[in-house]
Amino acid sequence: LDIGVGKDAKGSMKIREFLRKHPEYAGGTIGVVALDARGVLCAATSTGGVTLKLPGRVGDTPLPGAGTYANKFAASSATGTGEYVIRSLSCRAISEGVERGKSLDDSVTEMLAQMTRDFDADVGFIAIDANGHAVANHSTAHMPHAFFKDDSKIVARMFVEKA
């Protein structure tokens, strides 16, 4: 496969076409964000795997601020094209937006819009703020996610309108 990076690269299109024809090769990122009873925010992300990745490639998942980030204002996890998530340090930017006074919804929505504008990237985010407000938003075709608070009913969603 011809794999390229950048707004004009055709590599990601070829990968998407390949995965549409061969969904058995698709992997998925798993992200978790939480606010515990003491008010501590945390985030964790598991990579979608190494299928169709270049040898030696380091994705966004292990890089704090890129695919995973938490501070006292917000915690978030990203999924999508890792190179774009790395370039934007998207999860850190979401927390910094909340720290500057933006709502979590606005911070996530603005980061998603920026990544779509700058990279035409297929990405998604889950995030939670220090008040326990959770957000999931994406530009991918789908991003299954679920959330609950205390003893509340678990809410699970498979499809959400694209931003």
Model-derived features: positions:
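N-terminal nucleophile
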Residues: 1-163
